[in-house]
């Protein structure tokens, strides 16, 4: 369940900014039918930063209910205060989720020792599998391979989403962890190369709109059919890149609406609607991918 194409699913909202259950059901049904390995609910792409804690928990539980054991659900549970991250994680004990995706603390920029102690404390307060999440472009701090190696020895820490896009990280981390430590790319554009170097899959933004293609690409890569996987990847490459033409999840939420997967592309401030130029850029990438 922690391999292949795992979607960082958007959180669909109605025009008033309330979570839209009907659209979330449609999205989850789409991923079940498309072969997506698992869903990450309320991660970065799911707008964790603009949901309060009760809403955050409610959306994860809604996703679990709608998934109805057809597809595993992973909860985003990161925070920049350790006690807050522990509290959020503990909300999901015995809930039915299969694990947590826990981002590095943002804004306060802890040291490597601070990062180690943060993740260690979370893991010690739950039995849920923990996936570390390193995305320094958003958080302002970088979880270095040496620290990952230390954390890999902590009970319940089972893998990492590595979103630097730096492919040298794969081998650097692999040298410091056991073979069963899960390495997931957090960068769609380099995910196939990441897998060819020994990664196990991707937590994907692109999969929101190209679920079947991403699942097939990851399946081919896992079977060693990299030439065939690369054909799919090249068709998706403009989409991998252009879904970040404006801050995530603005473009991907609009793309979901354009494909009829959600009813609206409503976001909460400070996220604002996609611009006209952004819309045309993403539409062209969707056409190149054969999705329009």
Curated annotation (Swiss-Prot):
Key words of the record: Amino-acid biosynthesis, Cytoplasm, Diaminopimelate biosynthesis, Lyase, Lysine biosynthesis, Schiff base
Subcellular localization: Cytoplasm
One GO cellular component term: cytosol
Xref: SUPFAM superfamilies: Aldolase
Statement: the UniProt record of this protein carries the keyword Amino-acid biosynthesis: yes
Enzyme class: lyase
Pfam families: DHDPS (PF00701)
Record: active site: 133, 161
GO molecular function, a single term: 4-hydroxy-tetrahydrodipicolinate synthase activity
Pathway: Amino-acid biosynthesis; L-lysine biosynthesis via DAP pathway; (S)-tetrahydrodipicolinate from L-aspartate: step 3/4
Marked site positions, Part of a proton relay during catalysis: 44, 107
Biological function: Catalyzes the condensation of (S)-aspartate-beta-semialdehyde [(S)-ASA] and pyruvate to 4-hydroxy-tetrahydrodipicolinate (HTPA).
Name this protein carries in UniProt: 4-hydroxy-tetrahydrodipicolinate synthase
Natural source organism: Shigella flexneri serotype 5b (strain 8401)
